[in-house]
Amino acid sequence: MKKLTVARLGRTVGLHGDMKLHILTDFPEQFQKGSTFESDRGSLTIESVNPARGTVKFQGIDSVDEAKKYTNAYLYSDEETTKKSFPLGEDEYFWFDILGCDVFEEGKRLGKVVDIQRLPAGDYLLVETDKSFVDMKKAKSFLIPFLDMFIEDVHLDQKRIDTKGAQDILEAS
């Protein structure tokens, strides 16, 4: 089961073990009293959370010294839990499902999605270009806006994304 990074713990706040919570997910509602997360330093169960202040307190961590041991620790969920807890609508996808998909246009493989970059204008797929295009001196990677005008179809069962206009972006890169 693959771990998904959902948050990073920051500095301590106050005297009772509260910590800054830096949320790294599109689903902040998962941070509720009683929720348990794995961290790179052990399991942590939320005792309280204050979204307005961006802080969290965990059960059994009641002092600044105890909390400092978790500064910069990452909190993890997993794909299965995320899919169960947060059902998506039509034409909505989890990033972890999109990563690793092959990108095609008119039957030609353009490359593979290796990352998703969130930019002010929207989400972009970072595509590692197929060797056949790199051999023709094209860019080793390029960005495709995740918009209807470029994305024709997403076939998660085949790990395949069909595009239109993406080859033009590659050619211009």
UniProtKB/Swiss-Prot annotation:
Q: How does it assemble?
A: Binds ribosomal protein uS19.
- Which GO terms of the cellular component aspect does the record hold? cytoplasm; ribosome
The name this protein carries in UniProt is: Ribosome maturation factor RimM
Q: Does the keyword Cytoplasm apply?
A: yes
Where would you find this protein in the cell? Cytoplasm
Q: Which UniProt keywords apply?
A: Chaperone, Cytoplasm, Ribosome biogenesis, rRNA processing
PRC barrel domain: from which residue to which, for each copy?
90-169
Functional summary from the UniProt entry: An accessory protein needed during the final step in the assembly of 30S ribosomal subunit, possibly for assembly of the head region. Essential for efficient processing of 16S rRNA. May be needed both before and after RbfA during the maturation of 16S rRNA. It has affinity for free ribosomal 30S subunits but not for 70S ribosomes.
A GO MF annotation of the entry reads: ribosome binding
